Amino acid sequence: MDAFFAAVEQRDNPELRGKPIAVGNEGHRGVVSTASYEARRYGVHSAMSSVVALRRCPQLIFTPVRMSVYKEISEHIHSIFHDYTDVIEPLSIDEAFLDVTENKQDIELAVDIAKDIKRRIREELNLTASAGVSYNKFLAKIASDYRKPDGLCVIHPSQALDFIARLPVEAFWGVGAVTAKKMHSMGIYNGAVLRSYSKGGLISAFGKMGAVYYDFARGIDDRPVVVDRERKSVGCERTLEEDLTRRSLLSVHLYQLVLELVERLRRGKFEGNVLTLKVKFSDFSQITRSRTVAQPLTSKTRILPVAKSLLADIDVEHMAVRLLGLSVSKSAAGFHRPVAVQLELDF
């Protein structure tokens, strides 16, 4: 979807159409969740501090997040997808991979399915969507972002290598700011230069992701579309009302986060044995600390001591804390579940 949350707000509030808006909290502690395309022209983007966003775009209009509305629309969109295929891998509330090699409508060309889905979303929901069509997930994702908003891009196998050659490395999946900077230091600015490196050379520079970059530069991505992907983690976070350095106050917020996390775990019927603490500082730098335990983390009594221990290992006195986050995930080795044993009683 195109600037999904912001597009919904502009659809439902005609006075906001054509204006720069941000979905999120306008307060000095606020963060932009989604920015409209009008706002993006000023350099406003998601995860940006509201203060910085307003500095870049003084006329920016903030609207509150209405997650229940967005989820309902997302469900409608997925119902449209299911009219064509059940091989669907959701990536987020507004994005998914579809494998339409075999489809319910017996439509021969994938591009025609993409056109039909875009048409139905426009007619049924009055929203625009962008679609990418190609022979693997890497290229389909690149294509979907290529002509936003309301775009449709097809990358045919015969065109793939030329397309990738011109692609800046920042557009490659798995290449963030740090990796891009390292690639630039090696003289790698696009797919053509990336392709000139050996697999061994890329692995030496980037670890196991080097092999992935090697394949991507050659248009290779063998990942299948995974239906009903198992949820890997459950978490929650909160931006504090003011930056804090006092551990006693941070402990209060940590306790409240633990209670919220326990409730989310209960609702999601999720069990895991790895607890991760995320701390974002006032300069927007962040660190994470994780701990693996033997038994599932499902209750306050199990999670709170681990959370406190993780926080104790982080220096918060020299840099004020802006945000705390907690999440539970599953370790690769799994966890031990105590076995109930019936005791024998002598009478």
Spans of model-derived segments:
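DNA-contacting surface of Y-family translesion DNA polymerases
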Residues: 171, 179-323, 330-347
